[in-house]
C-alpha cells in the first residue's frame, strides 16, 4: 500500500513539475509582492497570446478619484487602467540586470530621466499594449530619492512612484524564487 501511495505521489509531483514550466497564456504568475505607503508592488511573469514570455514589475495600483483621469476637452474621462507595470526582460538574467539598473538610478542626479518599456493592466486583468514609460528621479519628501514612472496615453497621463526599498525587496524575492523553483524561470 505504501508503495502505491509513493508511486502516486511521485506521479503527481512529475505532473506538477511539467505544468509549472508551461505558464498559461494571459495568466499572471506572481513571484513576489510587497506593500509600502498603502501601495502594492509585485514582480510577476506573464505569457502573451503570441507566446512572448516576460518578467514584469508592477508599479502599484493607479490612484484616481472614481477611476477618472483629467482630460483637456471634457475635463474628466473614465479609464479602465488598474495598474501600471514595466517589462524587466524575457529571462531571469535580463530581469536581474534591469532591477540593478533601476537601483543604480537612485544614485543619479535629481530630474535624471530614463525610458522603460511599460504596459498598463486593464480592468480585465490582462496586460495592455506595450508603451514607453518615462522614469524621473525625484526627491523624497522625507529625504532620499524615489522614482516617478509616467505613462502617457494620448492626452492622458498616469504616474506612479517607486521607493528604493521596494526594488530591493522584490529583487530578493526573485532571487529566492529562482532558487526554490528553478524550472519555472528562463
What are these regions (language model features)?
Residues 4-14:
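Sec-dependent N-terminal signal peptides
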Residues 19-186:
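Positively charged, low-complexity terminal tracts
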